[in-house]
Design a protein with these regions (language model features):
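Surface/interface-facing alpha-helical segments and adjacent flexible terminal/loop regions used
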Residues: 1-145
Length: 145
């Protein structure tokens, strides 16, 4: 039982890490929380290669400002002069941003106690950032059972 709790807590941390790279926040405190999370995971890696990967990520991130990460995020996902990388399951499934996969996610979420905070989170329910966040929450809930 304890092993499952530990594994689910670790999963939650990694899902949060991934979510933070796909959910744009201009708030500096969120960026510094991401840096802190990477440091925690680096100090407690799943294995040697994960520790090295986390160290490489830390080296690339500016420890004092989120400006570079925000620019890279915009270039990848929003810049109209480049080929944007789409972030929704619906797009990859049907070629549209809001389709069957979004409906499936809404129906799935309706069966849980979790909800999307529509005041602070504007991406669709089938966006990769939201899915990672949801997986983190579900992993935390499993760990707490």
């Amino acid at each position: 039982m304890q092993d499952n709790q530990t594994i689910n807590k670790a999963r939650a941390l990694y899902y949060n890490l991934f979510a933070n790279f796909f959910i744009l926040s201009s708030k500096s405190e969120n960026y510094f929380e991401l840096i802190r999370l990477i440091k925690i995971l680096k100090e407690n890696p799943l294995d040697e290669s994960s520790g090295e990967a986390l160290e490489n990520i830390l080296v690339l991130l500016d420890p004092s400002s989120n400006v570079v990460l925000i620019k890279e995020f915009d270039d990848l996902f929003h810049n109209p002069t480049t080929k944007k990388i789409r972030q929704t399951a619906s797009f990859y499934n049907e070629g549209v941003e809001s389709g069957k996969k979004r409906v499936e996610m809404i129906e799935f979420i309706a069966k849980t106690k979790l909800r999307r905070d529509e005041n602070s989170y504007f991406e669709y329910e089938d966006s990769i950032g939201f899915i990672f966040s949801l997986m983190a929450e579900l992993s935390d809930l499993l760990a707490d059972d």
